Amino acid sequence: MSLPYVLILFYSRTEGTQNLALHMARGVDQVDGIEPRLRTVPPVSAVSERTAPSVPDDGAVLCTKDDLIGCSGLALGSATRFGNMAAPLKYFLDTTADLWAGHHLVGKP
């Protein structure tokens, strides 16, 4: 059986937010009995369509709904755009409405 994990989900066009996510992962890794799981989301086009997800060569892999369902805790990271999170992260979260409606994320800090 695998350890419970904190899902560290981020979007970073530059390395700033990604570096913060890596530091968070190091902190989670210091706690016995839980592990970090770094995930990112694919970019979206200027017309808010999902672009074809590219599998990153290195760094965090793309997040799936199963990552959200299985996590014991969730940390989100994104640069802000006009007071909101970056569009790719918002788009991904908008696609998880079925998880919210199905109560799959209840009780996850």
Where are these regions (language model features)?
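Short, intrinsically disordered, charge-balanced linker/junction segments flanking boundaries
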Residues: G107-P109
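N-terminal beta1-alpha1-beta2 submodule of the flavodoxin-like/Rossmannoid cofactor-binding fold
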Residues: M1-L105
